[in-house]
Amino acid sequence: MTLLEQRAVEASSIQSSPFLVRHIGPSFEDQQQMLLELGHRDLQSFVAAVVPPDILETTAPTSSLPEGCGEVQAMEELRLIAAANRVRRSLIGLGYYGTATPALIQRQVLENPAWYTAYTPYQAEISQGRLEALFNFQTLISELTGLPIANASLLDEGTAAAEAMSLSFAICKRPQAHRFLVDAEVLPQTLAVLRTRAEPLGIHLEVAEPMTFQFDAEVFGVLLQLPGRSGRLWDPTTSIQAAHEVGALATVAIDPLAQVLIAPVAEFGADIAVGSVQRFGVPMAFGGPHAAFFATLEIFKRQVPGRLVGQSVDAEGQPALRLALQTREQHIRRDKATSNICTAQVLLAVMASFYAVHHGPDGLAAIARRVLLLRAQLERGLHQLGYPVQSIARFDTIEVICREAPAVHQAAALAGFNLRVLPLGVAPEAAHGFGISFDELSTDQELKSILQILAEAAGQPVPVLEDLGNPHLEELVGLPLRQRPWLQQQVFHRYRSETELLRYLQRLVGRDLSLVHGMIPLGSCTMKLNAAAELIPISWREFAALHPFAPQDQCHGYQRLVQDLEHWFAEITGFAGVSLQPNAGSQGELAGLLVIRAWHHSRGEQQRDVCLIPTSAHGTNPATCVMAGLRVVPVACDAEGNVDLNDLASKAEAHAPQLAALMVTYPSTHGVFEPQIREICELVHGHGGQVYLDGANLNAQIGFCRPGTYGADVCHINLHKTFCIPHGGGGPGVGPIAVAAHLMPFLPGHPLAACGGEQGIGAISAAPWGSAGILPISWMYLRMMGAEGLRQASAVALLSANYLAHRLHPHYPVLFRGQAGLVAHECILDLRPLKRSAGLEVDDIAKRLMDYGFHAPTVSWPVAGTVMVEPTESESLEELNRFCDAMIAIREETAAIESGQIDPQNNPLRRAPHTLAAVTAEVWDRPYSRAEAAFPLAEQRQSKFWPAVSRIDNAYGDRNLLCSCPSVEELADNSVLKPPLV
């Protein structure tokens, strides 16, 4: 192809997708320069050299994918789709409630790329802002529950309850213990997730009223709901004590708004508390994303699932925050991990923490009190109207069984309200009852409207209610109230004015490095552009305010959105069916393996329980296998980083009768397209197994090869990687699965929505379509890029990675290469020689990169002592060169150590990163200059990102674990570290 022809192709692509040139970083001329350096004449021939010929598709799939367009057209089309959602006032409850997101939090956090484009805070020195916000979140949860350890969020309440069940099961050492007792008042979606998670582990669920629980040595745990699904408040102390008497752990699923008023659940004896902070300022968004929480006793700190933020000290002795106790997590412990959770819901946890900062304890209590009093007034009105209402203590919800129910629902619908239909799952006209849940948005006028509806249905005059005055709240809730002051930490009192809160948010943003500052070249993470046009629609009321269990005729917009994405993802991957329910890659993995397991069981092959996993696999893979009830058998990799075919064949044959699946990542975790992927799939199929393809690296394949056509049976897709949902500092994510036709009947279902297959595995996530509220992001990306644009993006992602490998190879060995000496979309740089020659660890390079203004690549994975670099298609040639210049300059610094020019212990690498405070200190006792420390590149004198703290002492933080802000009393004790916030 001549240069003129290439320009014509580019012009055609730009015309068909005006957004394309905004998304792809290198210009056409830049791409030509990069290709020239790599020895290729055009992108087409370059891609043909990278992708194995037996899987390469020469044209983009187009049967269902649209042509690309500009952001204005895409947004207009999405506006029409959104308009098909009819937002009514939903008083359904069941874990999802109306809430008011403070405008400042919406504008400065949810819609702020400085917050939503950051990565999980593994590099803590440049992540102090969101670590502080998460520290506040953990403090909030710990104070709410009275439990000393709280994590930094989980995916949803159902998942959190399942993790509590798993922890209780793992802690119990009695071999006969296999029974988990569940409160009959638990939320239906939570019960569904529990059932899905319990069966593969051999756990027997028993659902009953807590007063009828049968305790014996076979019981390892209980789950109680407070308040219950019907709104009931009750004292769980007796049930918890009974559990403890047989050595079982007690988990209580709580409503955080109710917990604001009542005594902390720890005072009733709970070992674990779980729940969702959705009603703390996070929109319902048709089911998610929302941050769940998990709090427990200190003795279980090493079994807690998910991330845990702890306080330590830096090299200057100053307090600093970092992720604590990481050795319990999947990326280190693999199949021995406490959980497979990786991405959680950091952005939503941050929003909830700022909601608490915004309102403070008094503001939260005022909201909870208003909700409680409205419920009490409604109950009085129901009694006056003659409705049969049980006289029990409640918080926000009342359920009524009555013959007038169909008329109540009809009148409510005409007035613009959705009420809970009882029994759950039936049509309103067939209802035997109704439920009403008040929330933060409820008002006296809303109560009057509801009473008018109820009066009309009952044929009675509207009751006139006297003001309750100042009632004793303890009589209304039937439980001890919170007695001691809570949330007394300064952060929950200092920022009452919007001016002060705005400045606090801005101070925290300044302590975090995100994509607004520069490239984040994390391998296997795909930190690409999250365009503003893609993010704007998630705040539209039509998407943000819809209840996940609203009547189907109000949700046509979401139905269209889901349908489009399912069709497009099926086309892109070459599969027959898609489920959007998994709300993280880890949950996509679990869903995929459970689908495979269900298929085997449907064929009478229950003995198939072995999963082959390459030793290079991501830690979530083996951790997920264990959760799916499968046994992990490792498969070796050869010297080139590929799956060892001989070892695979040997293991597959040895375990043939028990072989359930192979989990394989493609391109491999070593960053190459393995040429024998078809042979691998055929080998596994030949022994009766299925092939699960981890889609973490799908960005290298779009438009050029499809897992469903080269042999995989199921694949999960990370929308927060390949399809532009931002990482949010550690979530939200979406991890749909795409499956072959024979697996479609087993796609996950849900008890309250029509989704999944006829023999579906059950709910993986609490909401039917998982984190539906952020699906518009991926819809916008796909709509604007179009089939050819997606193909172009993958080509440039491959080109950029190979350009980096080419430029850096003279300075750092590139560990693995595929055919023609090329890598895929990422490359691994070997830093191990520097340990031998200069005494440097990979962490020294990672921390020094901060001084150059970069987040480090993925460190020591999949090979210890290396970094894995993934530039994505969105970074410009200028930015790629800036990163290369930084890495080359660092190599020159290491050479100075090797030659003896600088001290091997006291040098810019071993002392990195360098803070503004350190560089401007009165005393400078280092053998290199302040300029060498802070401005290693001349351009940094014009624009410089400063690490907030010096290198953090991780070991100190784990030995002296502190996971929440100290109280005023604790701060008076000099043995407690001062919190980082001033």
From Swiss-Prot:
Stated family: Belongs to the GcvP family.
PANTHER family: GLYCINE DEHYDROGENASE (DECARBOXYLATING), MITOCHONDRIAL, GLYCINE DEHYDROGENASE, DECARBOXYLATING
Gene3D superfamilies noted in UniProt: Aspartate Aminotransferase, domain 1, Type I PLP-dependent aspartate aminotransferase-like (Major domain)
Cofactor annotation: pyridoxal 5'-phosphate
Modified residue annotations for N6-(pyridoxal phosphate)lysine: K721
Gene Ontology MF terms in the entry: glycine binding; glycine dehydrogenase (decarboxylating) activity; pyridoxal phosphate binding
Highest taxon, organism lineage: Bacteria
Alphabetical list of InterPro entries matching this protein: GcvP, GDC-P_C, GDC-P_N, GDC_P, PyrdxlP-dep_Trfase, PyrdxlP-dep_Trfase_major, PyrdxlP-dep_Trfase_small
Enzyme Commission number(s) from the entry: 1.4.4.2
Keywords recorded for this protein, A-Z: Oxidoreductase, Pyridoxal phosphate
Gene designation: gcvP
Oligomeric form and interacting partners: The glycine cleavage system is composed of four proteins: P, T, L and H.
Pfam family, one: GDC-P
Protein name (database record): Glycine dehydrogenase (decarboxylating)
Organism: Prochlorococcus marinus (strain MIT 9303)
GO cellular component term of the entry, any: cytosol
Catalyzed reactions per annotation: N(6)-[(R)-lipoyl]-L-lysyl-[glycine-cleavage complex H protein] + glycine + H(+) = N(6)-[(R)-S(8)-aminomethyldihydrolipoyl]-L-lysyl-[glycine-cleavage complex H protein] + CO2
Enzyme class, spelled out: oxidoreductase
Any one Gene Ontology BP term: glycine decarboxylation via glycine cleavage system
